[in-house]
Amino acid sequence: LGDVYKRQHVYIDLIKNDFTGKEFLTTGMRKEVDRCKLAIEEALKGKTVAMISSGDAGVYGMAGIMYQVAAEHPELEIEVVPGITAACSGAAVLGAPLISDFCLISLSDLLTPWEKIEKRLDCASQADFCICLYNPSSFKRHDYLQKACDIMLKNQRPDVPAGIVRNIGRDCENYEITTLQELRDKEVDMFSTVIIGNSQTEVINGKLVTPRGYKL
């Protein structure tokens, strides 16, 4: 267990009651580099520091930037503890939509140009991947899910099954099964995970299922 815990306020609030007596350091959004530098400063003091990352630290998480910022301190030991990313936890809620080949695409253009995101959506839907969308919407990107659906609808049927899981693992968790066409006008936020099936995905007893190819 760590002596010091580093992360945004929202994630610290989720764990602080489980680690009483520990020191917690928090930063705001878009302060990832500063957060890593603070963690290194504490580690250089001889403390064991735990960087808290939602889901899996190696999937849209803090593991990569932590290694980059700590590159000049090879004497520090970094251990990445695997977690459960939203694609896996969300898929479990929806059924079994990611049984076949799938890809993860973030709709956030904060670090990736939208033009590159558009190309990835187009190529992935052309290749008939099941697609899991991270960061589908925010206050400034309220129409990005609509844009993404319009791109995918060029390559997929409008009735391809899709699902939304909101607030995964929290008390207010909820989900809904829909279609790619209907998904376009659904309300989502940064705590939503969206999964679009491929051409073989079906709804079985209210759950999304993508066949692997077994003969029944």
For the regions a protein language model found, what residue spans apply to each?
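Short, small-residue-biased leader/transition segments that mark boundaries at the very start
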Residues: 1-5
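General beta-strand structural signal in soluble alpha/beta enzymes
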Residues: 6-8, 26, 51-53, 78-83, ...
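Short, polar loop motifs at secondary-structure junctions
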Residues: 7-13, 198-201
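P-loop/Walker A phosphate-binding loop and immediately adjacent motor/lid segment at beta-alpha junctions
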Residues: 10-42, 146-165, 214-215
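A short acidic, often aromatic-flanked loop/helix-cap motif at beta-alpha or helix-coil junctions
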Residues: 30-35, 86, 110-112, 169-172
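Glycine-rich phosphate/diphosphate-binding loops that line cofactor/substrate pockets in enzymes
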Residues: 39-47, 122-127
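A contiguous loop/helix-start segment that scaffolds small-molecule binding in enzyme catalytic cores
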Residues: 48-49, 126-216
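Class I SAM-dependent methyltransferase SAM-binding "motif I" and its flanking Rossmann-like core
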Residues: 59-127
